[in-house]
Amino acid sequence: MENAKVALVHDWLTGQRGGEKVLEVFAEIFPDAPIFTLFHFPGSQVEKIEERIIKTSFLQKMPFLQKRYRWYLPFFPLAVELFDLQEFDFILSSSHCVAKGAIPRPDALHISYVHSPVRYAWNQYFAYFSPDRLGFFSRRIVPPLIHRLRQWDVMSLTRVDHFFANSKTVARRIYRYYRRKAEVVYPPVDTELFQPSDRQGDYYLLVSALVPYKRIDLAIAAFNRNGLKMKIVGMGPDHKKLKKEAHA
């Protein structure tokens, strides 16, 4: 594999979170590898990624993408399958949605580093699509769409030679839903960014993306009951809903 042509595949580049931190490390390891991603919001990534060759799918030109990219979920499998990876000997995908479903050349090696199987299709389906989150029309169209996504998700497993998981929990999910074993490789950690402090505050701190699967609502409910202070740092689509629950 010394002279192998390498491609990196990542679901999408819309902000800087855990998956993108891992992709940043992959980009350092393979400095010449282009990045294939469904869509990219320019300026949303660190310079190491922004300066790379980034190849996007047809979704990049869809209307209202920046504010409503989740609307295009039914097209994600098709978009990743249309990436032409025939010139690459080694595919390294960073996947929490459809990146693992990229189609490699028959003799190419495909390793997928999985942050989680598709949460809203499997273990977190009801966190995303509970009845109180869906309107009349959505309650009729979402279940069959997610059913199709599950079918594709399982079918595309054969395109991956080896799975790696970012934790033992994710490795168990991979086996539960995919019946594939995954080796655990923990994500890189910047141990110099934070230093222990002798000062102690009078509140708890929660730092997270404000998305359904993080279950910030449970933490808010707990602190509403116990009377202790908690500060929440983060952004995401659940911001208004959670702020209302926190009486902030």
PLM features: residue spans?
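Short donor-sugar binding/catalytic loops of nucleotide-sugar-dependent glycosyltransferases
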Residues: 12-13, 207-211, 236
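Active-site donor-binding segments of glycosyltransferases and PAPS-dependent sulfotransferases
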Residues: 29-100
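Active-site proximal beta-strand in glycosyltransferases
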Residues: 90-93, 104-135, 183
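A short beta-strand/loop micro-motif in the catalytic core of glycosyltransferases
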Residues: 92, 158-167, 231
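Membrane-proximal helix-turn-helix segments that form the acceptor-binding/catalytic region
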Residues: 130-163, 171
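Acidic anion/phosphate-binding donor-loop and adjacent secondary structure
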Residues: 172, 176, 183, 188-202
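Conserved donor-binding/catalytic core segment of Leloir-type glycosyltransferases
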Residues: 195-231
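Nucleotide-activated donor-binding/catalytic signature segment of Leloir-type glycosyltransferases, i.e.
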Residues: 240-248
